[in-house]
Amino acid sequence: MSNEIVDKLYKVILDRIEKRPTGSYTVEIVNKGKAYVARKVGEESVETIVASLAENKERFISEVADLIYHLLVLMALEGVTPDDIYRELERRRK
């Protein structure tokens, strides 16, 4: 598995933000504003921590996936791409 799925999901998020399809969860949270999306990232962070301490591996994986999704939405609103993050991680590795 590679970072390809993250890139694909980010592109779907951008598409949803641009086209605003009815019934899209992405559109629903984006319409509530950046502060709302940032709060969702915070909520998902807490849920990820709780799952790591008190729940099974499958639940932890599910919460990490939720956190990554909400981070990607917030990144899209900030104009930050996964490539920006990959470059920063690579820079820190050196």
Curated annotation (Swiss-Prot):
Give one Pfam hit by family name.
Answer: PRA-PH
Instruction: Output one GO MF annotation.
Output: ATP binding
Pathway given for this chain reads:
Amino-acid biosynthesis; L-histidine biosynthesis; L-histidine from 5-phospho-alpha-D-ribose 1-diphosphate: step 2/9
Which example biological process does GO assign this protein?
A: L-histidine biosynthetic process
| Assigned protein family | Belongs to the PRA-PH family.
Q: Which gene encodes it?
A: hisE
What does UniProt give as GO cellular component? cytoplasm
* EC number assigned by the record: 3.6.1.31
Q: Which InterPro entries does this chain map to?
A: HisE (IPR008179), PRib-ATP_PPHydrolase-like (IPR021130)
**What broad class describes the main subcellular location of this protein?**
cytoplasm
* Protein name, entry field: Phosphoribosyl-ATP pyrophosphatase
| Compartment(s) | Cytoplasm
Q: Which reaction does it catalyse?
A: 1-(5-phospho-beta-D-ribosyl)-ATP + H2O = 1-(5-phospho-beta-D-ribosyl)-5'-AMP + diphosphate + H(+)
User: Which UniProt key words apply to this protein?
Assistant: Amino-acid biosynthesis, ATP-binding, Cytoplasm, Histidine biosynthesis, Hydrolase, Nucleotide-binding
